[in-house]
A protein has these predicted regions:
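Alpha-helical scaffolding within the catalytic cores
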Residues: 53-58, 77-88, 120-127, 177-184, ...
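Active-site gating/metal-coordination segments in enzymes
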Residues: 29, 81-170, 220, 227-228
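Bacterial N-terminal signal peptides
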Residues: 9-22
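Mid-to-C-terminal alpha-helical segments outside catalytic/metal-binding sites
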Residues: 2, 7, 28-37, 45-76, ...
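Acidic/histidine-rich helix-loop elements
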Residues: 39-54, 109-117, 231
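Catalytic pocket-lining loop regions of alpha/beta-barrel enzymes
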Residues: 149-253
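Sec/Tat signal peptide C-region and signal peptidase I cleavage site
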Residues: 23-27
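Hydrophobic faces of well-ordered beta-strands that scaffold small-molecule active sites
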Residues: 35-39, 70-72, 97-102, 138-140, ...
Length: 300
């Protein structure tokens, strides 16, 4: 009788420990720094500091989320300048601003930038001016809703310019447009550094994503809004986990604060990343969360 009681007690203790360990493992989130590689500070968010999300508000959200650096690109570029000017505030929040020239002065530019010569002139003017934190480090985000527009005259000139000036490109495009854009550079995409916003928001298959990464060594995948990325409990789906483990130096995370609702849920967005990052080996998680972005822009 005592032996039976002892076995039952031991069994309960063992299963209890396993259950506790499992819950603890599930709850373990990545706790290190984050690099937000896709952030917008658009006019509706700040509106000359009278909008719902002035600089102190957005910096507080970044600080609460453990975000230590951002790629800032805004419509118009005044939003990025506002963040860059707030040097004391960003220093207090321990946030580094990496400024990009966005191609949009207003919403109508989304559909015409690739053929509008005034956009190219605007980019050149912004690059000449720079920002309070130094030169612009990249161009974008821009959108191509039809991949054929990657062959627009201005799109061609901007890709060549980006490679020539060693600027990083942030592009919201499909997989066909990646090939077209890369073809417009002198190196045919072998030297251009391009952040693929959403890593193909249209749902390019994982094998196609991998093929493009093999083809273009400077292609980085940013993972906001990526269809099929996460499965149960917010963990990575198996094929994406496998791809990230295979190419740990090629992925980035981002908030994509394109509307104010994304600012209102900023902490939740970043927590979602911490959940699935916690399921990766620690060194890989840190690469995706911070190291890759920091290395891309020389912040290490």
């Amino acid at each position: 009788m005592f032996t039976l009681f002892f076995r039952k007690t031991l069994t309960c203790w063992v299963f209890g420990f396993i259950s506790f360990w499992s819950l603890t493992a599930l709850a373990a989130e990545y706790s290190g720094p984050l690099f937000d590689a896709h952030l917008h500070y658009n006019t509706e968010a700040w509106n000359g500091q009278t909008g719902p999300h002035p600089v102190p508000d957005v910096l507080a959200r970044m600080q609460r989320s453990g975000v230590k650096a951002i790629v800032s690109n805004s419509r118009p570029n005044d939003g990025t300048i506002a963040l860059a000017q707030a040097r004391a505030e960003t220093a207090a929040a321990s946030v580094t601003v990496v400024p990009f020239v966005r191609l949009y002065r207003n919403r109508s530019d989304y559909d015409t930038w690739f053929r509008d010569p005034t956009i190219y002139d605007m980019v050149l003017a912004e690059l000449a001016l720079g920002t309070p934190v130094g030169p612009y480090r990249g161009i974008g985000e821009f959108h191509l809703y039809d991949s054929a527009n990657a062959n627009g005259a201005v799109a061609k000139k901007l890709m060549a310019l980006a490679e020539e000036k060693q600027l990083v490109v942030l592009a919201h495009v499909d997989d066909a447009a990646i090939d077209l854009l890369m073809a417009h550079t002198a190196s045919k995409g072998q030297k251009l550094r391009l952040i693929w916003a959403h890593t193909g928001i249209g749902g390019a298959p994982v094998k196609r994503v991998e093929a493009l990464m093999v083809k273009y060594p400077g292609l980085m995948g940013e993972l906001s809004y990526r269809p099929g990325l996460t499965c149960d409990r917010g963990d990575l789906c198996p094929e994406w986990r496998e791809l990230i483990l295979k190419y740990p130096g090629r992925f980035l995370i981002g908030s994509d604060t394109w509307i104010n609702q994304r600012w209102q849920t900023y902490e939740d967005i970043m927590r979602g990343y911490r959940i699935w990052l916690g399921g990766l080996p620690p060194a890989v998680a840190k690469k995706v969360a911070w190291d890759n972005g920091a290395a891309l822009f020389g912040l290490n």
